[in-house]
Design a protein with these regions (language model features):
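Solvent-exposed soluble domains appended to multi-pass membrane proteins
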Residues: 1-222
Length: 222
């Protein structure tokens, strides 16, 4: 039988509720048209709408960030939770302004954004630190642990979201701490990401706030 590259993620899918497009329950959702890049996947999953190319006049689909308003009239999960009094933070290891992700998050939910620039400004990384899109997922999960602990210390409910990037095309980023079990970088990066995600989930499950917490794991795009 074939050896799984991501056994930890497969186990999470099979032992929990999985919205897979496969009968086996292993595999992500089936991507719809105009949801196949980062900010489009974020918008589709939070507001249920695709980002049509005509929104940017036929230009590069990430040009939506140049507009003052991001999807005016759309109503997202972030806005629902904001009205319910949730503290909301989004952690990412790249610049939130890319593709207009910052506008999506601030105009549809009033998120506190902790991105690559935030990490530099607050001394989490040095000013000249740059790997891959900004900083690697190993740091992302550590910063997410710190932020989850901070949010949980408040008496308000919270929505913490994080966006991994090591598995992003074209080449993907293989952290030096990741094992090189397989013969190619693609497999090794995904295998490492599977372990990192599972470790973060297990950490959350060990925390006092886990009892009233829902964890959602989703691929933002292919």
């Amino acid at each position: 039988s074939e050896t799984s590259i991501i056994p930890e993620l497969e186990e999470l899918a099979l032992k929990n509720t999985s919205f897979s497009n496969k009968a086996s329950g292993v595999g992500g959702a089936l991507p719809a048209t105009n949801t196949g890049w980062t900010v489009a996947g974020m918008a589709a999953q939070s507001a249920g709408v695709p980002l049509k190319e005509n929104l940017v006049g036929g230009r590069d689909h990430n040009a939506l960030g140049e507009f003052k308003k991001f999807l005016p009239g759309a109503y997202s999960l972030g806005e629902i939770l904001e009205k319910q009094g949730y503290n909301q933070t989004f952690v990412m290891g790249s610049e939130a302004s890319f593709g207009g992700r910052d506008k999506l998050l601030t105009q549809h939910g009033n998120f506190n954004i902790e991105d690559y620039n935030y990490a530099k400004k607050h001394g989490k990384i040095s000013d000249d630190y740059k790997v891959w899109w900004g900083y690697e997922d190993k740091k992302l999960f550590q910063f997410a642990r710190e932020e989850a602990s901070r949010l949980a210390a408040s008496d308000k409910q919270f929505n913490l979201q994080l966006l991994t990037a090591d598995t992003h095309f074209t080449d993907r980023y293989l952290d030096e701490t990741c094992a090189k079990t397989f013969s190619n970088q693609y497999d090794n990066v995904h295998a490492c990401s599977s372990k990192q995600v599972a470790a973060f989930v297990n950490w959350v499950k060990s925390q006092p706030f886990y009892e009233n917490t829902t964890i959602i794991i989703s691929g933002d795009h292919l």
